[in-house]
Amino acid sequence: MNTVKTVRELRAAVARARSEGKRIGFVPTMGNLHSGHAALVAKAAQRVDFVVASIFVNPLQFGAGEDLDKYPRTLAADQEKLLEAGCHLLFAPTVEEMYPDGMAGQTRVSVPQLSEGLCGASRPGHFEGVATVVSKLFNMVQPDLAVFGQKDYQQLAVIRALVHDLNMPIQIIGEPTVRAADGLALSSRNGYLSEEQRAIAPVLYRSLSQIAQAIRNGERDYPKLVAEQQQQLEAAGLRRDYLEIRQAQNLRPATAQDRELVILVAAYLGATRLIDNLHLDLDTPA
């Protein structure tokens, strides 16, 4: 695996791979990688001949008071994990390489509606930052396909819409969330949790699972289900940001008639914000 830090080097390496007839896969990350990221790279490696990953902590998607400065930078360890997972090329640019003219006047990409509500409500500007940097990276790499984790469900929906609306010839693959044995979704931010908090955190997935089971059992009073689980989260010591049941395809509020749902949660455990979701297809057996 080679590591490059400039757009020029990146494009040259991808051009060489294309000249050899290779299909290109892409996995963008912010680094501090775990088994979930490795699964994304492995999925890409199954589908294409040449896998590119990026590591870039994107300032545009962090708001005031968020964890931009303390977000872990672990490049050496990340390189080892990428190599083991089947990555061929790592793009690890600086902020200056990505935004050579600064960020104040940077052209922005916005995906309305899907970016509103849920994480978009509590993190204003976040998805604009995501859509902008992903658009830049897609233009730099020009992959045949890109793989994203389903843990960031709203982000995945935003990126699917971005690719569709801007006519980008890129296949977007959503890879199922990788979980610890106790159900907690793997996340780079789990490292912020104390031992006591880590023991509490799996309640997020338990709440999602209990809602899903109740719906499968015929319960359609969604506000009641949400209220019950909100109480469970608060009793466990979490501060809820949101807990909602939405239509899986468009993230609109779910009705009793909808058959494909996604249950989404975001909550604070101490100062750490955790997110998770559970997809539910009522036409498919559990």
Swiss-Prot record:
Catalytic reaction(s) noted: (R)-pantoate + beta-alanine + ATP = (R)-pantothenate + AMP + diphosphate + H(+)
Binding site for (R)-pantoate: 61, 155
Keywords carried by this UniProt record: ATP-binding, Cytoplasm, Ligase, Nucleotide-binding, Pantothenate biosynthesis
Enzyme class: ligase
Pfam families referenced in this protein's UniProt entry, alphabetically: Pantoate_ligase
GO terms of biological process kind: pantothenate biosynthetic process
CDD domains linked: PanC
Subcellular location(s) per record: Cytoplasm
Chain ranges passing through the membrane: none
Cellular compartments per GO CC: cytosol
Pathway assigned to this chain's UniProt record: Cofactor biosynthesis; (R)-pantothenate biosynthesis; (R)-pantothenate from (R)-pantoate and beta-alanine: step 1/1
Residues at the catalytic site: 37
Binding site for beta-alanine: 61
Superkingdom of origin organism: Bacteria
One Gene Ontology MF term: pantoate-beta-alanine ligase activity
Note: The reaction proceeds by a bi uni uni bi ping pong mechanism.
Summary of the function given for this chain in its UniProt record: Catalyzes the condensation of pantoate with beta-alanine in an ATP-dependent reaction via a pantoyl-adenylate intermediate.
Family: Belongs to the pantothenate synthetase family.
PANTHER family (alphabetical): CYTIDYLATE KINASE/PANTOATE-BETA-ALANINE LIGASE (PTHR21299), PANTOATE--BETA-ALANINE LIGASE (PTHR21299:SF1)
The protein's assembly and partners: Homodimer.
Full protein name: Pantothenate synthetase
Taxonomic source organism: Pseudomonas fluorescens (strain ATCC BAA-477 / NRRL B-23932 / Pf-5)
Gene that this sequence comes from: panC
